[in-house]
């Protein structure tokens, strides 16, 4: 007898895996009909755009790329400034002999009197220090020179860039970025999982081939459970974050029935899956250290923006196809004003810090406690306050809470070593002012991380210790994912429509621009020799915008 559930799962997985391989023929056909808006359509945008140097020339990928193209043609000082920043960045990311070589190269190329590439735009004390720099004070002096170089670029070069064809091209891309987004913009594939308000499925952008995960929140379910505020807060936080170690939001839109968040596709499974479903329980130590380094960096990025994660646990740490991990599910994250605290109870029981259970004031301390619990679980295959027999004998929630408040974790598993025990103990200090990460300290400086070069890690230059197999779907079978019951008796009003509109803002600049670059569409549409196809609707031709669907 045919197992239809198994067949459905096979079909879903096959289509999903095939989509990740791409269809170049279909993609080329679609792209021939695309074109950027005409320059004259960008006049209002030129006036309204915030002329912030850091945003336009450093953070936004297309803006950064076009500003660098301008600098390469903007005269000797502009060219030299760009070369210096590139060479200094190379030095910052180098190690050992390569770092020494890069330092010597910078001194000889930019600091020696009479050099063709001397930094002539430097003035005063910084110029004097640059010319006299030595190996001993190199790092300190170059920090000052870097700041002065950026100040130079923010002046006349930035002003002249805004009057150049390169900035005109940037405005065309910004106008294109504003295109309306709907479900017709994507192909939809298998369901990856379900949560309290909806499901997560794999999607693919039709025009670029980029794969994403789409979190579809049921509008009626949100309204019934009063989840609108939480959904909007998660969306706004995701828009703000820009870290390799936190899932990126690329698009936000709505359909008749759902609010949709389109985010990084993390198809390597979550860490909980890797702890409990692959081989022996637990994860190898080199992987644990690597993942924790990325997690800690992601948490610090949130804390720098006064955002507390509040749901740190292995289940919320996802791996991508390259084996890099990111924090996900920011539904419980909250922004806390500087100097303020909260005492709200939130999180997952086994990872809750004492201050959450006691409902006493807290800020970022709760994330470091939860990270300590997560490291323990990755090593041992069980959480520190449930113990190894939790599966055989269910430990009641009240008992777990009692242990968190009154007991110290036991380190009986054979894979615990001295450094690992120490960092876990430091994270699981019951008093906040004694806890690692809560004493104006950086947890990444603990000896446990001695094998990690964090500058290179943040630049994405360290190869992961484990890479997912490309032909494996690290997600539950579609038949194992429970269906939702129908929501009846829920109607929408003007207030709901206003909320949906506030949520549905389309493309998110940084992630969208990176997609355009990574998939080659930026180079293709920016090619001055490219011949535009006659494809597209009459409305497209009249407006000069691209054919979207």
Curated annotation (Swiss-Prot):
Phosphorylation at Ser-33 is regulated by light and activated by cAMP. The active site is at residue 311. Residues 186-449 form the Protein kinase domain. Keywords: ATP-binding, Kinase, Lipoprotein, Membrane, Methylation, Nucleotide-binding, Phosphoprotein, Prenylation, Sensory transduction, Serine/threonine-protein kinase, Transferase, Vision. It catalyses: L-threonyl-[rhodopsin] + ATP = O-phospho-L-threonyl-[rhodopsin] + ADP + H(+); L-seryl-[rhodopsin] + ATP = O-phospho-L-seryl-[rhodopsin] + ADP + H(+). Retina-specific kinase involved in the shutoff of the photoresponse and adaptation to changing light conditions via cone opsin phosphorylation, including rhodopsin (RHO). This is Rhodopsin kinase grk7a. It comes from Danio rerio (Zebrafish). The lineage of its organism: Eukaryota, Metazoa, Chordata, Craniata, Vertebrata.
């Amino acid at each position: 007898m045919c197992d239809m559930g198994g067949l459905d799962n096979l079909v879903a997985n096959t289509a999903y895996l095939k989509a990740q391989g791409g269809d170049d023929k279909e993609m080329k056909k679609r792209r021939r009909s695309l074109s950027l808006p005409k320059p004259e359509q960008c006049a209002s945008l030129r006036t309204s755009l915030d002329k912030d140097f850091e945003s336009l020339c450093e953070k936004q990928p297309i803006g950064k790329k076009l500003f660098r193209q301008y600098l390469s043609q903007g005269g000797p000082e502009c060219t030299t400034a760009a070369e210096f920043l590139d060479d200094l960045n190379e030095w910052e990311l180098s190690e050992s002999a390569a770092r020494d070589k890069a330092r010597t190269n910078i001194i000889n190329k930019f600091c020696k009197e009479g050099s063709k590439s001397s930094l002539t735009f430097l003035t005063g004390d910084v110029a004097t220090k640059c010319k006299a720099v030595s190996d001993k004070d190199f790092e300190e002096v170059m920090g000052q020179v870097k700041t002065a170089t950026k100040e130079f670029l923010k002046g006349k070069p930035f002003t002249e860039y805004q009057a150049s064809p390169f900035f005109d091209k940037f405005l065309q891309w910004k106008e294109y970025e504003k295109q309306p987004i709907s479900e017709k913009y994507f192909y939809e594939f298998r369901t990856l999982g379900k949560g309290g308000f909806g499901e997560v499925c794999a999607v693919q952008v039709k025009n670029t081939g980029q794969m994403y995960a789409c979190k579809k929140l049921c509008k009626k379910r949100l309204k019934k459970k009063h989840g609108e505020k939480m959904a909007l807060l998660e969306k706004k936080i995701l828009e703000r974050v820009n870290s390799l170690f936190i899932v990126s939001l690329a698009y936000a839109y709505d359909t008749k029935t759902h609010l949709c968040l389109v985010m990084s596709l993390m198809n390597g499974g979550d860490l909980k899956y890797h702890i409990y479903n692959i081989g022996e329980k637990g994860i190898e130590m080199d992987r644990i250290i690597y993942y924790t380094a990325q997690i800690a960096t992601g948490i610090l990025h949130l804390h720098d923006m006064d955002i507390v994660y509040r749901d740190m646990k292995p289940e919320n740490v996802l791996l991508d196809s390259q084996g890099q991990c990111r924090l996900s599910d920011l539904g419980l994250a909250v922004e806390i004003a500087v100097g303020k605290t909260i005492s709200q109870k939130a999180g997952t029981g086994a990872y809750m810090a004492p201050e959450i259970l006691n409902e006493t004031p807290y800020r970022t301390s709760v994330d470091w406690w939860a990270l300590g619990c997560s490291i323990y679980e990755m090593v041992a295959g069980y959480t520190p306050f449930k113990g190894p027999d939790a599966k055989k004998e269910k430990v009641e929630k009240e008992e777990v809470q009692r242990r968190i408040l009154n007991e110290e974790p036991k380190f009986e598993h054979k894979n615990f070593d001295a450094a690992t025990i120490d960092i876990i103990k430091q994270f699981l200090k019951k008093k906040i002012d004694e806890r690692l990460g809560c004493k104006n300290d950086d947890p990444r400086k603990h000896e446990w991380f001695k094998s990690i070069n964090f500058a290179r890690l943040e630049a994405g230059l360290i190869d992961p210790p484990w890479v997912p197999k490309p032909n494996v779907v690290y997600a539950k079978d579609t038949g194992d994912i429970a269906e939702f019951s129908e929501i009846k008796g829920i109607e929408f009003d003007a207030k709901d429509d206003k909320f949906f509109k506030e949520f549905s803002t389309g493309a998110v600049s940084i992630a969208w621009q990176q997609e355009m670059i990574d998939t080659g569409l930026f180079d293709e549409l920016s090619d001055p020799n490219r011949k535009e196809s006659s494809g597209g609707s009459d409305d497209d031709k009249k407006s000069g915008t691209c054919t979207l669907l």
